[in-house]
């Protein structure tokens, strides 16, 4: 597994699967039982695949991406996550073949008003 393989998989997720709604590409990027730490989705692909197919697309902008060993961290601006703009950080663990085997995320709605002039992105 190389950093380029990992970046390629992540670009496919955000550009083609989320932004373009090509959910059928996801199984080719994932291996094993796919451990999911988001409490809204079960382990395995069925939950996230169903969500993507129902949503049709999940418009987003990748702001930052970092890779450390077998982990990748992606700071994302979700333009319409459940009806609202949302800041997210996705963490993916890859196996030796460059396939995703585990996922964590944190999501925070972007507030209409902030107590500082800093953006979330």
Task: Specify the residue positions occupied by each region the protein language model found.
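C-terminal and inter-domain tail/linker signature
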Residues: 1-121
């Amino acid at each position: 597994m190389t950093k380029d393989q990992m970046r390629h998989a992540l670009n496919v997720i955000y550009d083609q699967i989320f932004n373009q709604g090509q959910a059928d590409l996801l199984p080719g990027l994932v291996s094993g039982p796919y451990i999911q730490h988001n409490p809204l989705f079960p382990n395995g692909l069925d939950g996230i695949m169903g969500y993507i197919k129902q949503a049709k697309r999940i418009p987003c902008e990748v702001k930052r991406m970092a890779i450390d060993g077998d982990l990748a961290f992606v700071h994302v601006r979700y333009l319409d996550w459940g009806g609202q703009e949302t800041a997210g950080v996705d963490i993916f663990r890859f196996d030796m073949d460059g396939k995703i085997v585990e996922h964590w995320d944190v999501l925070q709605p972007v507030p209409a008003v902030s107590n500082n002039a800093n953006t979330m992105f």
